[in-house]
A protein has these predicted regions:
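Short coil/turn linker and secondary-structure boundary residues
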Residues: 90, 183-187, 247, 255
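Glycine-rich beta-alpha loop elements in corrinoid/cobalamin-binding modules
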Residues: 1-170, 177
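N-terminal [4Fe-4S]-dependent radical SAM core
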Residues: 144-220
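Low-complexity, intrinsically disordered regions enriched in charged/polar residues
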Residues: 105, 183-186, 263-266
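Conserved Radical SAM active-site core
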Residues: 2-49, 54, 60-63, 68-79, ...
């Protein structure tokens, strides 16, 4: 789960020469702003297909945002990608609820009630209990409005107290962010972590030497998620929320035992932790 622009460029905006997330470490196999590019290509090819976007790239661009690479304000990626629904945060609850709704035959434009999602609408007549953010025009006109908007967003990252947020755009377009999805319980964290993952790259990548980034995490264990720090240099709270969610000790030990069975295991586990590990 890697932002395509961070993947491609250094902090000084120089193009990276390698890509650790691509087979063989070769650069240039995915486009800049991949969510937007792929979303529009899918829409052109499958005009009526429901398009659901998520992950770090979509999550951090769910509302109007400052684009460091172009040094300009950009609209919600939901609008630019042509997607129907954006899942923000980690998404386990939301993606299951969306799948259930689609399986039940509900049109995608009626799936507007799921926490942890963002959708667009042309009217606020059926949108209730929301906080109105500064409009796109107001954001573009004054940087202070952008700061005020982001502050409201930061204050509504809690799944218990978070409000629904509405960001108006020209031509009666509204981007609606539902309240954050409920955090995972310890049992749910354990269940997600202990699914029968392949724990390897696809065999098709063997000829290229595999995926370099995998070596860094193959013998690591994620024990928790969420961060209450809100550090100005880090977007983690804005993606995972500020509530700490932890796996059980038994679950971590079961994964550790599983790692020892790998033929490449050399006797040590690189890391056990996650964001704010010292606070959990």
């Amino acid at each position: 789960n890697m932002d395509s622009m961070v993947n491609h460029y250094s902090v000084t905006k120089h193009r990276r020469h390698t890509d650790a997330y691509t087979p063989g470490g070769e650069e240039g196999h995915r486009p800049n702003r991949a969510v937007t590019v792929y979303g529009n290509l899918i829409r052109q090819t499958f005009k009526d297909a429901p398009i659901i976007i998520g992950g770090i790239e979509a999550s951090l661009r769910r509302l109007a945002h400052y684009d460091y690479w172009q040094d300009k304000l950009k609209r919600s990626v939901l609008l630019d990608s042509g997607a129907d629904i954006l899942i923000y945060g980690m998404g386990e609850h939301a993606i299951v609820e969306i799948a259930d709704a689609l399986d039940a035959g509900l049109p995608v434009d009626q799936i507007t009630y799921i926490n942890g999602t963002v959708y667009r609408t042309g009217s606020l007549d059926e949108v209730y209990d929301y906080d109105l953010l500064p409009s796109w025009d107001d954001l573009a006109a004054d940087k202070l409005n952008y700061a005020r908007s982001f502050n409201v967003q930061q204050q509504n990252m809690d799944p218990i107290t978070g409000h629904r947020l509405v960001e108006p755009y020209p031509n009666s377009v509204y981007v609606v962010q539902n309240p954050p999805s409920a955090t995972l319980t310890t049992d749910e964290m354990d269940e997600v972590a202990e699914l029968p993952y392949a724990r390897d790259w696809h065999p098709d990548y063997d000829a290229a030497g595999g995926v370099p980034a995998f070596a860094e995490i193959k013998f690591s264990i994620s024990s928790n998620r969420g961060c209450f720090g809100e550090c100005s240099f880090c977007a983690l709270t804005f993606h995972q929320g500020r509530v700490l969610q932890m796996r059980s000790h038994d679950s971590i030990m079961r994964e550790a035992e599983l790692l020892t069975r790998d033929p490449e295991f050399k006797g040590y586990i690189n890391d056990v932790g996650g964001p704010t590990a010292n606070f959990s």
